[in-house]
Amino acid sequence: MKQEIQKGDVATLSFEQALKQLEVIVENLERGDVPLEQSIDIYERGEALKKHCEKLLKAAEAKVEKIQLSEGGTPEGVEPLDSE
């Protein structure tokens, strides 16, 4: 089933909205029945959506903190989550 790709500013989308649009784009491109010019347009939108999702994930990751425990096992503070 061919799904419509929404237009509009990617920056205003939530992570979930952007991810859903990205999934629709992938489905449409994988089917292979999209004309070349439209494929290029939706591929470019997909790239913008991917970057937006990565930006939102990075921001969420920065908010997550790791609890520091003392030698006795009691919480004594927090530190940023290590990026690996």
From Swiss-Prot:
Q: What is its main location?
A: cytoplasm
The reply on keyword Protein biosynthesis is: no
**Record's function text:** Bidirectionally degrades single-stranded DNA into large acid-insoluble oligonucleotides, which are then degraded further into small acid-soluble oligonucleotides.
Q: How does it assemble?
A: Heterooligomer composed of large and small subunits.
Q: What UniProt keywords are attached to this protein's entry?
A: Cytoplasm, Exonuclease, Hydrolase, Nuclease
EC code(s) of this entry:
3.1.11.6
Gene Ontology biological process terms, A to Z: DNA catabolic process
Residue spans making up a coiled coil are none
| Entry GO MF terms | exodeoxyribonuclease VII activity
Checking Gene3D superfamilies in the record gives: Exonuclease VII, small subunit
Instruction: Identify one Pfam family in the record.
Output: Exonuc_VII_S
**Gene Ontology CC annotations of this record:** cytosol; exodeoxyribonuclease VII complex
Which top-rank group of organisms is this from? Bacteria
Q: Per the record, what are the reactions this protein catalyses?
A: Exonucleolytic cleavage in either 5'- to 3'- or 3'- to 5'-direction to yield nucleoside 5'-phosphates
List the protein's name: Exodeoxyribonuclease 7 small subunit
